[in-house]
A protein has these predicted regions:
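Amphipathic alpha-helical domain-onset/packing element
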Residues: 94, 136-144, 150-213
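Hydrophobic, Leu/Ile/Phe/Ala-enriched alpha-helical segments that form helix-helix packing faces
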Residues: 78-89, 194-205, 246, 250
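P-loop NTPase switch/coupling surface
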Residues: 1-154
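Soluble or luminal CAZymes and related metallo-dependent hydrolases
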Residues: 74-77, 186-193, 238
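Aromatic-acidic/polar surface patches that form glycan- and anion
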Residues: 16-18, 89, 183, 187, ...
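Switch/communication elements of ASCE P-loop NTPase nucleotide-binding domains
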Residues: 1-7, 197, 207, 212-285
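Glycine-centered tight beta-turn/hairpin loop motif at sheet-sheet or coil-to-beta transitions
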Residues: 31-35, 203, 224
Length: 285
């Protein structure tokens, strides 16, 4: 929650107990070995250098108005450690920190928006909204962008094969064989990670893709049938969007990884994970 009266993520005024004037949150995270350690100057006297601590405060004044304070020196230091680690290792990713409230639903699928360079910035993986619900709008925008990139790669690959003089002299089966072989060699780690994660969590879901012609729409292959995403039950739609948005965040934080879902790490909080799921789906979560 971003309080306009103070910089940073802080607490709500109503989080303070009725008989108290102040609330405090202590946060401690373990620093991975490959990131480094806090310098001696940034440590408190009895704190291990492999841990990073910071505190959030909210204090009520005499008028009942809360003022916020955050002690984030160690947090700033660990951010610097990650920045230095990424400079020395391009495969180094950032940790996932995400929270999904209990109210999760698909309001609309924004797959019309495109060519937004901000979609792939790692900062978009850390969005934490003050509103008490999630609509997964960022996931659908991201899905459109990565699908467009894959289609552009396939079109370029097809054009290169068409312009290959040696293939022009061969028969059609030879051309199709080369096309299939070249497509297998093409890497699309973001879409591959998405589809693998969805298939793992929802085995009945065979594919999720954007259909461009004759009309732009989101399609699925579910239980052996091709259908519109909107035709799925609310339970399945929400679960696809939730898994997809987690994958989106991991891909943004591990942009150079071929397996972002397997190599990424962090903290993921899902409130009432079985909320709005049907009985059969809730039993296997």
């Amino acid at each position: 929650y971003n309080d306009l009266r103070a910089a940073g993520v802080v607490m709500l005024d109503q989080d303070i107990m009725l008989t108290r004037l102040q609330s405090k949150i202590d946060i401690r995270v373990h620093i991975p070995n490959d990131i480094g350690r806090l310098t001696e100057s940034s440590e408190v006297q009895d704190q291990a250098p492999c841990y990073c601590d910071w505190q959030l405060y909210k204090t009520l004044n005499s008028h009942g108005i809360g003022s916020s304070k955050a002690e984030t020196q160690h947090l700033d230091n660990i951010v610097e450690l990650y920045q230095n680690a990424i400079k020395h290792d391009q495969l180094q990713g950032l940790p996932l920190i995400a929270y999904y409230p209990a109210e999760r639903f698909v309001n609309e699928m924004n797959i019309l928006s495109k060519n937004n360079p901000l979609i792939f910035q790692s900062a978009h993986a850390y969005e934490i909204s003050a509103i008490p619900f999630t609509t997964f709008s960022r996931f659908f925008e991201w899905l459109r962008e990565v699908s467009d990139i894959e289609n552009a790669q396939i079109a370029q690959l097809f054009q290169q094969l068409l312009c290959n003089p040696s293939l022009q002299k061969n028969k059609e089966p030879d051309f199709l064989q080369h096309l299939l072989h070249a497509q297998k060699q093409m890497h699309s780690p973001h879409l591959d990670a998405l589809k693998q994660a969805l298939t793992t969590v929802i085995p009945a879901l065979e594919d999720l893709f954007i259909q461009y012609q004759p009309k732009l729409q989101l399609m699925v292959r579910y239980q052996g049938k091709s259908m519109l995403y909107q035709q799925l039950s609310n339970s399945v739609k929400n679960w696809i969007a939730l898994v997809g948005d987690i994958v989106r965040r991991l891909c943004l934080l591990n942009p150079n990884s071929l397996y972002p879902c397997l190599e990424g790490d962090g903290i993921l909080l899902i409130d009432a994970i079985d909320h709005q799921l049907d009985q059969n789906t809730a039993q296997v979560i």
